[in-house]
């Protein structure tokens, strides 16, 4: 889970390791151990890999669940199967996505607290969860950050097919080199 942070038209580069590694913001101090060695990182809750792991654990814990009807082997579970389970009304999957939104909301509240009002755009496979992800994200952000900052901030989702990363890079070049935008 990464972020492209743009401040006054300039991409924040940070240290040689980089900037925008929001996947390693702690959102659950008592949470699972992350690959980075810390506990409760956003990455352990909100990455597509962690969503698959969490839903897989639910399927393994209940072999008669609707998820098991969609995939016979929980180890073969993928995001597409999770979307199908969600469309079928699976409440366990709905809860996983709600928790994912809440974790993103905690991270967003931290970003808003540090950077001030900002635009936060969700992109990638999790963007397909739409309002089911955004609503708990916004609610959590609003509960955890200064109201004046959250009112001035925007949270949204890009279409899954969007080339937002390429478009953002092109916009930075146009702005920085040509003064356009």
Each language-model region and where it sits:
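A structure-centric signal for secondary-structure junctions around beta-strands
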Residues: 1, 19-22, 152
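Short beta-strand scaffold segments in enzyme catalytic cores
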Residues: 2-6
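ATP-binding/phosphotransfer module of carbohydrate and carboxylate kinases, centering on a glycine-rich
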Residues: 11, 29-33, 38-181
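A short, polar/charged loop-to-alpha-helix boundary motif
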Residues: 18-30
């Amino acid at each position: 889970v990464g972020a492209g942070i743009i401040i006054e038209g300039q991409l924040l580069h940070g240290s040689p390791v980089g900037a925008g590694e929001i996947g390693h913001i702690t959102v659950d101090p008592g949470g699972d151990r992350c690959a980075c060695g810390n506990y409760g990182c956003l990455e352990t809750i909100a990455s597509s890999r962690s969503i698959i792991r969490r839903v897989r654990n639910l399927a393994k814990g209940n072999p008669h669940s609707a998820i098991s009807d969609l995939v016979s082997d929980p180890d073969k579970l993928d995001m597409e199967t999770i979307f199908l389970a969600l469309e079928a009304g699976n409440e366990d999957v709905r809860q996983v996505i709600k928790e994912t939104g809440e974790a993103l909301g905690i991270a967003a509240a931290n970003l808003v607290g540090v950077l001030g009002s900002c635009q936060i755009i969700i992109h990638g496979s999790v963007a397909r969860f739409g309002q089911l992800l955004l609503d708990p994200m916004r609610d959590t952000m609003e509960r955890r950050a200064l109201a004046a900052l959250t009112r001035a901030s925007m949270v949204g989702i890009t279409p899954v097919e969007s080339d937002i990363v390429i478009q953002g890079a092109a916009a930075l070049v146009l702005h920085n080199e040509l003064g356009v935008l």
